[in-house]
Amino acid sequence: MVKATKAEKKIAYDTKLCQLIDEYTQILVVAADNVGSTQLQNIRKGLRGDSVVLMGKNTMMKRSVRIHSENSGNTAILNLLPLLQGNVGLIFTKGDLKEVSEEVAKYKVGAPARVGLVAPIDVVVQPGNTGLDPSQTSFFQVLNIPTKINKGTVEIITPVELIKQGDKVGSSEAALLAKLGIRPFSYGLVVQSVYDNGSVFSPEVLDLTEDQLVEKFASGISMVTSLALAVSYPTLAAAPHMFINAYKNALAIAVATDYTFPQAEKVKEFLKDPSKFVVAAAAVSADAGGGSAQAGAAAKVEEKKEESDEEDYEGGFGLFDEE
């Protein structure tokens, strides 16, 4: 079998990536740091059916994206270019983005702390019996970890932050974690960005619930309404408030000047004779009281009627009445 040349491999890669872009409209950009070939193979098997994982050098991926954009006129795909930084891969999918992202996360595997590795998380060693004999205390002393000898073994007294996130793992830390059998890190494909029909967004968006989306939408409408009212720019949300404010302003002008309109006449009347406020309030109170009185009277009539019916009943059937 003739081995393909470097140029032929590039052409084949360009063809494959362009075909995938034509077929799929959703792409997950994933970081692949410290991911082994076996682990990557398992991820491919797990996503088989509606997703395809494609790895490659950034320069090759960028070139293929540009070629596809030039040949197809699809300029939206160029939004991928700024995302192709570092050790990344592409997952083309037709499935639900959240479900695919969750499936990818299942394939993280534990890994030991190797010397020189940048810690992705804080590493804290919890207190407890280590199972190591007293001759191993030198490891703990170098790292200033308080210990005591308990039943012939070394016991850590308090929790110790051994490595901070972002720090490089030293030889002493790596040796101690190996002796304790601790694999503090886990590695796998990590979704960094999401491309969907030309739009690019953070993977955190996939975790938003419907309630959170509604809340954010309502908050956005409130902000737009406030801005529209502040600059007197009519929008659908601000229009009712603008009409009410305009009516109040017109009413204030009518009260302060001789200009008038039907709705302002009643206000002017009340302002000229404030006692009419009392009359109006009394009328409202009387209406409410009258309704209560009528209800009370009706209840009393009904009560008397029931008493009368009871008397008739007792008069007609008094079998034990004395003569």
UniProtKB/Swiss-Prot annotation:
Gene3D superfamilies named in the record: 3.30.70.1730, 3.90.105.20
Regions of compositional bias (Acidic residues) in chain numbering: 308-323
Positions carrying Phosphotyrosine: 313
Keywords noted in UniProt: Phosphoprotein, Ribonucleoprotein, Ribosomal protein
Record keyword Mitochondrion present: no
Region (Disordered): 287-323
InterPro entries to which the protein is assigned, alphabetical: Ribosomal_protein_uL10 (IPR050323), Ribosomal_uL10 (IPR001790), Ribosomal_uL10-like_insert (IPR040637), Ribosomal_uL10-like_insert_sf (IPR043164), Ribosomal_uL10-like_sf (IPR043141), uL10_eukaryotes (IPR030670)
Job of this protein: Ribosomal protein P0 is the functional equivalent of E.coli protein L10.
Quaternary assembly: P0 forms a pentameric complex by interaction with dimers of P1 and P2.
PANTHER family membership: 60S ACIDIC RIBOSOMAL PROTEIN P0 (PTHR45699), LARGE RIBOSOMAL SUBUNIT PROTEIN UL10X-RELATED (PTHR45699:SF25)
Name under which the protein is recorded: Large ribosomal subunit protein uL10x
Species of provenance: Arabidopsis thaliana
Primary gene name: RPP0C
